[in-house]
């Protein structure tokens, strides 16, 4: 991975608190998953996290309208799209880490921020998902529902 500078912040609060303080909720956190693969295959680490997350929430990959997967390496995206049958029209639609950078410690909130802005540009979006893998084989996925 290259080394990039960047920062991001995500404001998380109870829906009632947001409304009482003049904020309009956009994304509602539903669930998250942390899974692992053998450390020799870190590019595949988001796959079991995504699979477990959507199964536990009784969804399919087709139910997810927008997906962000951190692409520190292009082979990670190839493996994930092939194994999960993700169409490129729903994946990293605002550009991924190879295009925009991959600042360590900020990538997760950057992906969620991109999803936040993208759901405001589009109609009929119900579920969005972000996932990231680590060099040690750990994959993390998070699922949000769009607040209407």
Regions found by a protein language model. Give the residues of each.
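Claisen-condensing/thiolase-fold acyl-transfer catalytic domains that form or cleave C-C bonds
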Residues: 1-148
């Amino acid at each position: 991975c290259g080394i990039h500078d960047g920062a991001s912040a995500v404001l998380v609060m109870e829906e009632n608190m947001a409304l009482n303080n003049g904020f309009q909720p956009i994304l509602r956190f539903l669930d998250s998953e942390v899974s692992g693969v053998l450390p020799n295959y870190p590019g595949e680490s988001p796959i079991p996290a995504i699979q477990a997350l959507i199964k536990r929430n009784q969804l399919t990959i087709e139910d997810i309208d927008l997906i962000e997967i951190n692409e520190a390496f292009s082979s990670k995206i190839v493996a994930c799209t092939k194994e999960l049958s993700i169409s490129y029209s729903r994946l990293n639609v605002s550009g991924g880490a190879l295009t925009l950078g991959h600042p360590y410690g900020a990538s997760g909130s950057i992906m969620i921020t991109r999803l936040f802005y993208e759901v405001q540009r589009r109609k009929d979006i119900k579920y969005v998902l972000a996932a990231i893998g680590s060099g040690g084989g750990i994959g993390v996925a998070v699922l949000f529902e769009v607040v209407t």
